[in-house]
């Protein structure tokens, strides 16, 4: 494979599975497993554009919520059920996350997203990786 092909076919990291909270459980009381994927640059930029006037925290919430595979916070049935339960209109993954999570759970979700996407890597860390 030449260099050109390597740039066209990057080896993306697999989705991660994690337990967000022991308050979301199955019928046996076992904590539910959540799954997160990487967003494409186009997805991330669109989410950022749509939330730019809402502040950094809202952008991060929207990114983290949109990256979830399980549960799918864009599922129309889930959004309708959350709207009915919360007596407010829930239209987006970010609104769904805020409707169903506690503040501690929301912070943990943002932390998982931040860590998974390696958003905290410094330029020095990236340069060190390139040298190895």
What role is predicted for each listed range?
Residues 8-25:
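Short acidic, Pro/Gly- and aromatic-enriched capping/linker segments at domain boundaries
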Residues 1-13, 123-132:
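Low-complexity intrinsically disordered segments
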Residues 27-132:
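Short, surface-exposed, charged amphipathic helix/loop patches that serve as local interaction elements
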């Amino acid at each position: 494979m030449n260099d050109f092909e390597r740039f066209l076919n990057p080896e993306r990291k697999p989705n991660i599975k994690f337990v967000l909270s022991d308050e979301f459980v199955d019928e046996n009381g076992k904590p539910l497993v959540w799954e997160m994927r990487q967003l494409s640059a186009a997805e991330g930029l669109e989410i950022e554009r749509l939330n730019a006037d809402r502040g950094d925290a809202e952008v991060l919430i929207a990114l983290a919520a949109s990256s979830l595979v399980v549960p799918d916070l864009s599922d129309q049935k889930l959004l309708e059920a959350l709207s009915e339960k919360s007596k407010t209109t829930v239209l987006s993954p970010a609104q769904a996350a805020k409707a169903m999570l506690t503040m501690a759970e929301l912070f943990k979700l943002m932390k998982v997203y931040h860590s998974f996407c390696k958003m905290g890597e410094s330029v020095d860390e990236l340069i060190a990786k390139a040298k190895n």
